[in-house]
Amino acid sequence: MSLFDWFAARRKDQFVGKVIQETEESDGLWGKCPECGQVVYRKDLLTNANVCSNCGHHSRINSEERIKLIVDQGSFIALDKNLAPIDPLGFKDRRAYADRLRESQASTGLKDGVTTGVCRVEEIPLALAVMDFRFMGGSMGSVVGEKITRLIEKATSKKLPLLIVCASGGARMQEGMLSLMQMAKISGALERHREANLLYMPLLTHPTTGGVTASFAMLGDLILAEPKALIGFAGRRVIEQTLREKLPENFQTAEYLLEHGFVDKIIPRTELRKTLGKLLRLHGFQKITIST
C-alpha cells in the first residue's frame, strides 16, 4: 500500500461512520446495528428512515432518501439537474480526477455531490439543498458550490426560507483553489439572503467537516444537527497532536456542540419534517404558491 493509499483509507474510515451491516445468510432481509448489536428486519429499518428502533442509531441515507424524508410527497422540483463537473486542472494523484468523477457518477446516478430544488414542507415553500456523501465523500467542488449558490439566489429572489443538508469531508482537493473559492461565494450569497430577512437553516449530518464546516454549515440562523453526527474542521488526531492534549470522548459530536453553543437543536431523523414545519411557521412562513 502506498503512502497516499494509507492516508486515503484512514480519512475514509474516519468519516464514513457506522452503517447497518447485513447478517450472515440473511439474503439481505436482516441487518445488525453496529451500535447496540440488535438484529433488525431491514424492511422495518427502511420504514424507520434507517434509524435503529432499539438504540436510535442513525445510519447513512442517500440524497434521494433524504429528500423523500423531508418534503411533502411530489412537491420537490429539482434545479440545475444537468450541471456537471469537469477536470479544469487535469488533476491526477494515483488516479485521474476525471476517472474518479465517472466512477462516482456511475455508482450514484448523480452528476455531482449535491441535489438542489424547491419543495414544500407541511405545505410551506422551501429552497432545499441535500449533499450526498456517496459522491467523492460529499466533497465541495465548483459544481457543488455553483448549485448551492444558485439555489440561495433563487431563495432570495423568491423570498423563500432555505435548508441545506450538509454531509461532506470538505473542499475537493482535485479542484484546488476553484474548490476553496466556493466557500466565499456561498457565504456571500447567504449574506444577501440574510439581508433580505429570510431564514436559513443548515442541517449537519454525519459527517460535516473541513471547508463546509468553515463556511455555510455554520452560518445559519438556526443550526440543526442529527444525533451523534461528527461535526468539525480538522480531524481529532490532528488536534490532539497539535494541542498535546487528550480530547473528550464526545468531542466533535452534535451533542458536544449543542452543549457548547455551536448547535441550536438536535433533531432525530424521524421527527425532522414535523420539526421543520414548526420552525418555519414560528418564523412567519405560510402556505403560498411558488414558481420555478
UniProtKB/Swiss-Prot annotation:
Keyword Hydrolase: no
Location of this chain's protein in the cell: Cytoplasm
Listed cofactors: Zn(2+)
Pathway given in the UniProt record: Lipid metabolism; malonyl-CoA biosynthesis; malonyl-CoA from acetyl-CoA: step 1/1
Enzyme Commission code: 2.1.3.15
Keyword annotations of the record: ATP-binding, Cytoplasm, Fatty acid biosynthesis, Fatty acid metabolism, Lipid biosynthesis, Lipid metabolism, Metal-binding, Nucleotide-binding, Transferase, Zinc, Zinc-finger
CoA carboxyltransferase N-terminal domain segment(s): 29-292
Gene Ontology molecular function: acetyl-CoA carboxylase activity; ATP binding; carboxyl- or carbamoyltransferase activity; zinc ion binding
Entries under HAMAP family matching the protein: AcetylCoA_CT_beta
Organism: Prochlorococcus marinus (strain SARG / CCMP1375 / SS120)
Protein's name according to its UniProt entry: Acetyl-coenzyme A carboxylase carboxyl transferase subunit beta
